[in-house]
Amino acid sequence: DWELIAIDDHSTDLSCKILSEYQKKDNRIKVFKNLKNGIIDALRLALEKSNGSYITRMDADDIMANIKLEELIQLLLKHKKGHVATGYIKYFSTNKKLNDGYLNYEKWLNCLTAEHSNFSEIYKECVIPSPCWMISKSDLIQIGGFNTNTYPEDYDLAFRMYYGKLKVIGSKNILHYWRDYPERTSRTNPVYSNNTFPKIKINYFLKNELNQKKMLLLWGAGKKSKAIAHLLVQNKIEFSWITNNPKKIGKTIYGRKIFNCNTFEVPENSQLIIAIASKSFQPILKLATIKDTYRFC
């Protein structure tokens, strides 16, 4: 059995009217208006109104595979509580060509899902597709539900799943078709800009991973690493900044000198944040042996 909780978040088309007609025909469909504003408030309202033991969500403009709900619920029934179920996703667009960024994300995400290893790269990018997961309601409430005001809300939820010790179980079937279009909220709303990603990563890193007894190294001197360095400085975190980019070696940014990673003496007891987005990135042996390493790109 199932129930559909549809939240009208100030829509300007006929969505609410159409849903209301379906609601009259099927009492499993329930429509509510979001009296506040935005996705987080809509999610809170939906969870509050839900009666089921398992929760999943998706956006109204996407398409789920016919087998999606059955596939996800069977995974959870088999593995019990303490798990989040997900599956392959596929991007599509009806009015534009998909760019490489979305296609690369789709491939990367599906590869992680195939191995149930999504959380192994939690600091790179959001590792749980926001419209393609299912979790027991009790587990969702235990990790805080939708009670935080942190954006991107899907990435924040993925971090809370990870630090809530949930395990990923993935289906190798395409369960969700994810629409991309120019007016998509993640494209138009500044809370989803790339500028918000370093902040959420650093916040969770400082709260859960930073070891004051180890030297923290930041490797990289590009745009993303500068954003991370700025956040570390703002939080008064001691770190050493290294790069193999000859144009950046010796420069001082945010009051921090950038050292040559090839000649920098790396303490045995170190933590390493790698913030290098280049596809041609090659690890240096003395840094590759640092076990306490976090890939931020």
Residue ranges, per PLM feature:
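Glycine-rich, basic loop-to-helix element that forms the pyrophosphate-binding segment
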Residues: 34-50
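Short aromatic/hydrophobic "clamp" motif used to bind/position activated sugar donors
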Residues: 55
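Conserved donor NDP-sugar-binding/catalytic core segment of glycosyltransferases
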Residues: 67-102
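Catalytic beta-strand/loop signature of glycosyltransferases that borders the donor
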Residues: 88, 168-175
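A conserved acidic beta->alpha catalytic loop
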Residues: 8-17, 59
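Catalytic core of nucleotide-sugar-dependent glycosyltransferases
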Residues: 173-181, 187-212
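Acidic donor-binding loop at a coil-to-helix junction in glycosyltransferase catalytic cores
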Residues: 151-157
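Short, flexible, basic/aromatic active-site loop/helix in glycosyltransferases
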Residues: 88, 103-125
